[in-house]
């Protein structure tokens, strides 16, 4: 909790302690922010959830495979693969949209999800393009802008139901 007499300073503190996001959808950060919102109770619940982590990852892996089987049948769409040398936690299901083959681009597909009231999001803005980091050293990352413009994260909650997946697939198949 933050207490202040100055409303502007209070607003600034809240802004900085909630990641300093200026655009929730595209993860735009014009200042360096922090994520200082974990209470002791939330920390205890998080530790208790760790016991379920292997089962959660297994469910998310299974759902990823189900999505992938269907999405592989749609020209111009593909879920990013997990390389053989990696062990993924399947946190996100990142959909690569090839506009030429699919017929519409990532942003138009995002609007279709929004119209269907299904949450989907672009991947995070590239750090080296964010205002606080523009003047910092960055490695050569020639492929990153290509992927940034073409990836959409689709619903991937551990509690995702078959019916919800079906709704996502209906949107993907309707172009």
Regions found by a protein language model. Name each.
Residues 5-175:
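PLP-dependent aminotransferase class I/II
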């Amino acid at each position: 909790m933050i207490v202040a007499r100055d409303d502007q300073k209070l607003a600034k503190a809240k802004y900085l302690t909630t990641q300093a996001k200026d655009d929730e959808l595209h993860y735009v950060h014009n200042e360096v922010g922090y994520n200082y919102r974990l209470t002791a109770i939330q920390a205890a619940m998080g530790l208790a959830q760790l016991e379920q982590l292997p089962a959660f990852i297994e469910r998310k892996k299974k759902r990823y495979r189900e999505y992938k089987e269907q999405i592989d049948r749609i020209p111009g769409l593909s879920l990013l693969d997990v390389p053989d040398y990696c062990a993924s936690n399947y946190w996100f299901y990142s959909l690569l949209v090839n506009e030429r083959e699919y017929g519409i681009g990532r942003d138009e597909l995002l609007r279709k999800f929004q119209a269907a009231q299904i949450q989907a999001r672009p991947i995070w803005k590239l750090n080296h393009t964010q205002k606080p980091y523009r003047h910092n050293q960055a490695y050569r990352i020639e492929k990153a802008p290509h992927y940034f413009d073409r990836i959409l994260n689709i619903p991937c909650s551990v509690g995702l139901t078959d019916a919800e997946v079906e709704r996502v697939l209906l949107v993907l198949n309707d172009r």
